[in-house]
Design a protein with these regions (language model features):
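Exposed beta-sheet edge and beta->alpha loop/turn motif
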Residues: 44-89
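Core segments of small alpha/beta cavity-forming domains
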Residues: 1-29
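Amphipathic alpha-helical interface segments used for dimerization/assembly
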Residues: 10-11, 35-40, 48-53
């Protein structure tokens, strides 16, 4: 969807923490294996997208996930929550 792509584009240009996290995880032997964008359950009257980065350990196969929420309601997107661990429900 266009909103999900807007969130990904915004983060790739305006949020260096996604690159910092990828570098930190690489030092721990984790590879970036996926990036997903999903509509947040927190969006009542706002368009909020959660962008989730998944990292997989090269030796053990263990997966760690981190996410950041982006509000896309207005013309200019902005961060709702900073990068934090993500847990599947």
């Amino acid at each position: 969807s266009t909103d999900k792509h807007r969130a990904l584009n915004y983060l790739s240009v305006r949020y260096p923490a996604i690159y910092v996290k990828a570098a930190e995880e690489l030092e721990r032997n984790f590879l970036l294996t996926s990036v997903n964008a999903i509509f947040s359950r927190l969006s009542d009257n706002r368009k909020i997208v959660s962008v989730i980065q998944s990292f997989t350990n090269k030796e053990t196969g263990a997966v760690e996930k981190y996410f950041v929420r982006v509000d896309l309601t207005e013309e200019f997107p902005f961060i709702v929550t900073k990068m934090a661990p993500y847990y599947d429900r």
